[in-house]
Design a protein with these regions (language model features):
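Metal-centered catalytic cores of metalloenzymes
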Residues: 2-8, 12, 17-74, 78-139
Length: 139
């Protein structure tokens, strides 16, 4: 009986620890209306984001269309709640054409801010150098 109980406890602990470090799936709907201040644009996009708490690896696939011109830059910004601006936290390279895929390793503070919903994706153009479309990253 003791062996069965110990084995059951070990299995539960293993499942609990693997669940605690499972990939966290997030998303962002990216529009001009979310820019601060809002922009008038036909541009829109979406992002599928995943985060591995064990390795702190952030991965993304971003799709966008309808911008006023080519994307000149893209970043994860934070920490900031929706409706607030913040500096660049993670650059998004190769943003010139959609889809954009990439990954980065975050530090502890960045990981905490991301998981708390305090990161947003911003895509910039020449006509809107402060950002043409933006979307808060949420679970």
């Amino acid at each position: 009986m003791t062996k069965i109980l110990c084995g059951s406890i070990a299995a539960i602990a293993l499942l609990a620890s693997s669940a605690a470090f499972a990939q966290v799936k997030m998303k962002a709907d990216i529009t001009g209306a979310q820019e601060v201040p809002p922009t008038t644009t036909q541009g829109k996009g979406s992002a599928d984001v995943s985060f591995d708490p064990a390795t702190k690896k952030l991965s993304w696939t971003i799709n966008y269309s309808g911008l006023s011109g080519p994307a000149t830059a893209a970043h994860f910004h934070g920490p900031a709640e929706a409706g607030k601006n913040a500096g660049v936290a993670v650059p998004i390279p190769n943003q010139a054409s959609s889809p954009v895929k990439g990954e980065a390793t975050l530090n502890d503070n960045q990981a905490a801010d991301l998981q708390a919903g305090r990161y947003y994706i911003n895509i910039h153009t020449a006509a809107n150098p402060g950002g043409e479309i933006r979307g808060q990253v949420t679970k």
